[in-house]
Structure formats: C-alpha cells, structure tokens
Amino acid sequence: MKNLSLTIALVFLLVSCKTLPEITPKEGSFEVISKQNTTLWNENHATFSVHLQNTNTKNSCEVYIVKNGSKKWISPSLLANKSLDFNVPENASVFIENFSSENIKINYSINQ
C-alpha cells in the first residue's frame, strides 16, 4: 500500500510539473501599425488554437508561427475582412506583418 501511495504521488507530481500557463486574456483586439509588425504570445504556454479576424475592409496582413527561431507562414494570409483559424504549438509565438499603409485592427479569441 505504501508503494502504491508513493507511485500515485509521483504521478501527480510529474503531471503538475508539466502544466504550462494558459494564455490570458482569451479574447480581445490589437492593432498592427502600418508597415510594421507585432509579435504575440511570446511566452511559455501550452498548445492552443486561435481565431483571428481582420476588421480592415481593404488590407491584408501576413501571419507566421515562430518557434525555436524558425518562422512558418500561415497560408492563406489574413485577408481583408476575413478570419483565420490555426493552432499555435507549445511555447511558439505569432508574428504578424502589415505591409499596407493603414493600421489593421485584429480581433482574436483563444481556445486552450
């Protein structure tokens, strides 16, 4: 019985050590300034899915996942007045590049 209790305690310890913080807030908006870029969620986190909505009616922007210094383009781009859904791997960040001459407001929601 003592060994069983020790085993259970070790399992709980291992599970709790692997728990990564969740991204907060779960929804909101941000602006990508004209001809600029922004990086989001550049912190330790578990894998999550994200929904991005471009509120600009004329301009698109490029979205990338960055992990371990490697940048991967999300296809298709975040088109004008459209949405994009994708998964962000554990401890990866999202890089958004705005090539247009207008600021782009993006709404987001996270499912983790």
Descriptions of predicted regions:
Residues 18-20:
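Bacterial signal peptide processing site
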Residues 25-38, 70, 79-81, 91:
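Tight coil/turn sites that cap or link beta-strands
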Residues 14-16:
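C-terminal motif of bacterial Sec signal peptides marking the signal peptidase cleavage site
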Residues 58-73:
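Short, surface-exposed beta-strand/strand-loop-strand elements in extracellular ectodomains
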Residues 1-4:
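Positively charged n-region of N-terminal signal peptides that target proteins for export
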Residues 43-52:
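Short coil/turn motif common to extracellular beta-sandwich-like domains
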Residues 54, 85-87, 92-112:
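Short, exposed beta-strand-loop hairpins at the edges of beta-sheets
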Residues 38-40, 73-76, 83-85, 94-96:
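Beta-strand-rich interaction surfaces with strong enrichment in secreted/lumenal proteins
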